[in-house]
């Protein structure tokens, strides 16, 4: 039976085995999907051993995405742009192909919620790996402007310069933010620490869409804050998790699974339905 893994540290909390098992059942694919939690300095050895022993593909999560980028034999265009790899496939000719499905998963989830991206003004909070992975897929949807805000302004400026060939990308400090945004995406991990980005509530209005890449069994702090100031549409990253997994499954198996029922099952599993 074809074997797949998710590599991370920590990774015991991962919902990837649950999701991919449902995808396999739905598409009648025979495979098994497990967890691997190597020490940070043992990732390369463990990854190579997995493929040497017949592994077909894997997902890679924190803190290994940048290491995976350096270890694979070839990169998809979107992985090159993201500077990180979250999906690896062993091709028929023995090549380890690195891909990044995070941004595609984000865009698919936004669209499933009816969020219009073309012609919109988007604010992206954070300039780390999650933001980098999201930029090219978001800009491919042709927003009028994408603004990056980050506590360290230089990081936002660097990211904006790197992606300016794909669209109108601006780097601003949190204090400089103004005007009306149609969508705010929080790519920071602030919600995991129970914290908020230093954002003015004046940016929140009834018609704005709010998206937090983090998720939990309750509203994240960022979503709760946005709702408190009048945001009517606020979404967490659970749908992105399922959509990026569907994209990875498609890369591996050549068949695209449906996501709606799997997301429903996952919410039930987490106790959020």
Curated annotation (Swiss-Prot):
Annotated active site: 65
Listed Gene3D superfamilies: Leucine Dehydrogenase, chain A, domain 1, NAD(P)-binding Rossmann-like Domain
Gene Ontology BP terms: amino acid biosynthetic process; aromatic amino acid family biosynthetic process; chorismate biosynthetic process; shikimate metabolic process
Coiled-coil residue windows: none
Enzymatic reactions: shikimate + NADP(+) = 3-dehydroshikimate + NADPH + H(+)
Pfam families assigned to the protein according to its UniProt record, in alphabetical order: SDH_C (PF18317), Shikimate_DH (PF01488), Shikimate_dh_N (PF08501)
Any one GO molecular function term: NADP binding
Summary of subunit composition and partner proteins: Homodimer.
One cellular-component annotation, GO: cytosol
Protein name per Swiss-Prot or TrEMBL: Shikimate dehydrogenase (NADP(+))
InterPro entries cross-referenced by the UniProt entry: Aminoacid_DH-like_N_sf, NAD(P)-bd_dom_sf, SDH_C, Shikimate_DH, Shikimate_DH-bd_N, Shikimate_DH_fam, Shikm_DH/Glu-tRNA_Rdtase
Described function: Involved in the biosynthesis of the chorismate, which leads to the biosynthesis of aromatic amino acids. Catalyzes the reversible NADPH linked reduction of 3-dehydroshikimate (DHSA) to yield shikimate (SA).
Residues given in the record as NADP(+) binding sites: 126-130, 150-155, 213, 237
CDD domains to which the protein is assigned, alphabetical: NAD_bind_Shikimate_DH
UniProt record similarity statement: Belongs to the shikimate dehydrogenase family.
Keywords assigned: Amino-acid biosynthesis, Aromatic amino acid biosynthesis, NADP, Oxidoreductase
Binding site for shikimate: 14-16, 61, 86, 102, 215
EC number: 1.1.1.25
Pathway: Metabolic intermediate biosynthesis; chorismate biosynthesis; chorismate from D-erythrose 4-phosphate and phosphoenolpyruvate: step 4/7
